[in-house]
Amino acid sequence: MGTGAADGSRGARRWLPWLGLFFWAAGAAAARGADGSEILPDSIPSAPGTLPHFIEEPEDAYIIKSNPIALRCKARPAMQIFFKCNGEWVHQNEHVSEESLDESSGLKVREVFINVTRQQVEDFHGPEDYWCQCVAWSHLGTSKSRKASVRIAYLRKNFEQDPQGREVPIEGMIVLHCRPPEGVPAAEVEWLKNEEPIDSEQDENIDTRADHNLIIRQARLSDSGNYTCMAANIVAKRRSLSATVVVYVNGGWSSWTEWSACNVRCGRGWQKRSRTCTNPAPLNGGAFCEGMSVQKITCTALCPVDGSWEVWSEWSVCSPECEHLRIRECTAPPPRNGGKFCEGLSQESENCTDGLCILDKKPLHEIKPQRWSRRGIENASDIALYSGLGAAVVAVAVLVIGVTLYRRSHSDYGVDVIDSSALTGGFQTFNFKTVRQGNSLLLNPAMQPDLTVSRTYSGPICLQDPLDKELMTESSLFNPLSDIKVKVQSSFMVSLGVSERAEYHGKNHSGTFPHGNNRGFSTIHPRNKTPYIQNLSSLPTRTELRTTGVFGHLGGRLVMPNTGVSLLIPHGAIPEENSWEIYMSINQGEPSLQSDGSEVLLSPEVTCGPPDMLVTTPFALTIPHCADVSSEHWNIHLKKRTQQGKWEEVMSVEDESTSCYCLLDPFACHVLLDSFGTYALTGEPITDCAVKQLKVAVFGCMSCNSLDYNLRVYCVDNTPCAFQEVISDERHQGGQLLEEPKLLHFKGNTFSLQVSVLDIPPFLWRIKPFTACQEVPFSRVWSSNRQPLHCAFSLERYTPTTTQLSCKICIRQLKGHEQILQVQTSILESERETITFFAQEDSTFPAQTGPKAFKIPYSIRQRICATFDTPNAKGKDWQMLAQKNSINRNLSYFATQSSPSAVILNLWEARHQQDGDLDSLACALEEIGRTHTKLSNITEPQIDDADFNYSRQNGL
């Protein structure tokens, strides 16, 4: 009974939809019939045996705020479609349906949709989400659609995990974590850097795909910034807290500087060296270098010992000139380690005949020689004993007549060293002191004196022509040389009895002066800072530095101050009775020598002339260059400009040639030439290791804007004339040198040059954007001899009260060397410490003529040439002299000269025009085995030049 009732109930429920469908269809038909509208047929053709097929099924949906959503279904063939939500049938009144015919198949298509509200979803409390599905009927049966879930969309406000700020070293890994807030549907994450979206597809170094995290594999300085995690879904967007990422650079030490000089002149002191934390400099809070920036060590300097006089000697025997004298020496003790020389006279002389001895209407006691050695006293005594006063008077009278006639017949200066008095108005500083025996190289073997010299001031003395000529003919300087050793103490031409440098001003002259010419050359002028420059019509018209001088048979030296360029005219290069106005110029305009291929100009273009002048012996031209010749990576050539303006190669520095000779020193090239013209040095790098030496310097000046300050960093060839052009430009712009220039080795490896400003004080100065680092292409630096190369930086003060500026200028070649210029200055001119452009000038005088232009006295030079020009069986000839003076190449050039030794000495004069290192020449002679005494051990204060005058007057 129960079973039958249950079956009946299930049967009733099974037929309930069909009954409802029937009554619904009947009511609908009646309604349409009552309205008179068209009634669709109850039986629509359908494919036999086909169940309803869903063309459109309901999709999952989200309710946003309070807006309802619509669920749709479409099926064919379908007589009716109903929605079932959460297992219950949706009421018929909530359905909206449409019917149509499928034109292709002729089947009936029915579409139904319902609305689901937020309230319906919230009121449902089931084990799963709110869901709905469609059920479609046909005469063959039913079909069900997929279940579509309906959820209320939301996005919570707070992130489950915000990204955290990081500080990482450069090239380190950065990982920023982000867990977005809970939401339906799940939020999508996007990363922002400084409010700009990050596209990981365009930057392979960044990955944002790993579980919403941001990963930067190798941190760069540009990766510093503020990072934000952005979460969004269909409801809202949420922003996380910003995370600051700082990529820092730890500082690194630069190389140590050289040790400084000892800070005391006497006793115990210290030396120091320093380094800077600039390799690299710390950035963005990076750690400063560990360790000390300055190191100090102790040092000891020898204390100076002042000299003291010994007791006076006995008075000498009365000489034929009615003079006797006594001497004392500064040897108790002698000055050492820079101590002061004894004050006072080293000798005293007086007339020993009560003024009765008369010479040429003047008492001889008015001629007061300043020094006489003990051996000279003994020799004077010998002369008095063996010669006799009567014979001396006769000899003097004969010599007076002979010398007077000789000098009147010659219009040029004599070639003897004593003739320099004609230029100095009677000032002489020659001195012989006979204290040692065995020096037959310089003096008469019978006399056997030593030669010592010093720098002293001598007043004008009255030397008569007869005595002068007697000294020329009888002086022991004309005896053959056997040994010599000389040491220079402090000044030009101190050793070997040659007077100090001085400039003699007078009227221009076209020829040399005869000995009898009475010109006003009695004043020795001080050093002149301005070169004497004379405009010549024959000089080129381009922009250039130039100087000129008049030279005769005695020769001389022409120097371009502060350029490193000089010209040496040897004694005898110009024939007697002739004199020439010789000029020298440096081209400062656009070089006329155009480089071919990899060839570069290494020196200035130097012109010397006149071009039609002929010389009897080669002259020496010194040209500065900027090549690093310490290693053999250059092929250097000497070139000359022809009259047609073209350049032709004279020789390669390493080649053998008999037409000219080139000696390459670290900073200059000394060339021996026979003809005047325009010359220059070019270089062709053999390898990428070839190095040009650049001089780097920084200048500064105020801008038109009172708050701005301009820095100009120059990189020019390391030649004095190139830097002098920079100085000239800066003087016109009002620039001031802020740091002493430094040397930078620039390789020929095609890598560019970088100039950057570092360590600018924050909150006081700022640099204009995008100018802190500037890069110069390799080609501009490698060929920078055309115009001075510089980089300009503009700094701005925050306030006008800022007057001090400190920063560092880093000049470095990529994959090469670098230099640091430390700027510490005041922008106020009244407080700024001036840095001189040149530590010392090249030469006091642009033109020096006669013996004063040479380091080696002419008489000594003659004896050296006479000795070494003679072939020697043991090989001790001019070739050995060349070898000992580091002249080992192209000796065939010297072999073609009439006096090889003279040309070697000319080259020595050109190389040592600055230091005057006569000791090196003396050492060379000693090594050859021709010297036995060392004159350089006799210190400068032990010698007085007046003794040389006295000995010459007495024929000693």
From Swiss-Prot:
Single GO term (MF): netrin receptor activity
Superkingdom of this protein's organism: Eukaryota
Gene name tied to this protein: Unc5d
Descriptive protein name: Netrin receptor UNC5D
Any one GO BP annotation for this protein: apoptotic process
Domain Ig-like: 52-149
Signal sequence residues: 1-30
Deleted gene: phenotype: No visible phenotype. Mice are viable, appear healthy, and do not display any obvious behavorial defects. Cortical neurons from mutant mice display impaired axon growth cone collapse in response to Flrt2 and a tendency towards accelerated radial migration in the developing brain.
Species per Swiss-Prot/TrEMBL record: Mus musculus
Subunit structure: Interacts (via extracellular domain) with FLRT2 and FLRT3 (via extracellular domain); the interaction is direct. Has higher affinity for FLRT2. Identified in a complex with FLRT3 and ADGRL3; does not interact with ADGRL3 by itself.
Domain TSP type-1: 250-304, 306-358
Database matches in Pfam families: Death, I-set, TSP_1, UPA, ZU5
Reported tissue expression: Detected in multipolar cells in the brain subventricular zone (at protein level). Detected in embryonic brain neocortex, especially in the subventricular zone. Detected in multipolar cells in the brain subventricular zone. Detected in brain neocortex from young pups, especially in the somatosensory cortex. Expressed in developing limb and mammary gland.
GO cellular component, one term: plasma membrane
